[in-house]
C-alpha cells in the first residue's frame, strides 16, 4: 500500500497593510533602535485574522469559496494600532489596538466558524489583533520617542501562504 502525500501549504487569513502604512510603521520601528530580535520585513506587515496551518493545496479553492460567503462590513474596517507590547511566549514585539472594533472580532469569528467544516486540527486561540514588528524579541518594551498611533483600514481580507520568513 502506498500513501499519497498531497502537497501542503501553511496558510492564514489576514488584512493587509497599505504601502503608506507599511512605510510609516517601518520608519517608526527604526526609531526604536532595536537591539534584539529579527525585524519583520515591512512588505510582510499584516494583521492575521485566522491561522489555518498546513492545508492540502487541493482544498485551497474550497476554502476560498467558503470564505467568500462571509459578509464583510459595509464600511472599511478601521483599527488603531496604538500600543507597543512584547509577547514573551511567542518572543514577538507587536503593535496592538487598545480597543479592537467589534466588526473585526466578528469577522475573525465568522472565518473561524466557516473553516470548521474543513476539519483543521487547530488549537483554539483567542483572537488578539496585532501587527508583528519583530520576531525572536527577548527584551523589554522599548521606549518610543513618539507613541504609536497607526490606522489600519481594510475593506477586504485575503488568504496568504507563509514560507519561512516570507508571506506570499
Regions found by a protein language model. Give the residues of each.
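Histidine-dependent nucleotide/RNA phosphoesterase domain, centered on the 2H-phosphoesterase fold
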Residues: 1-168
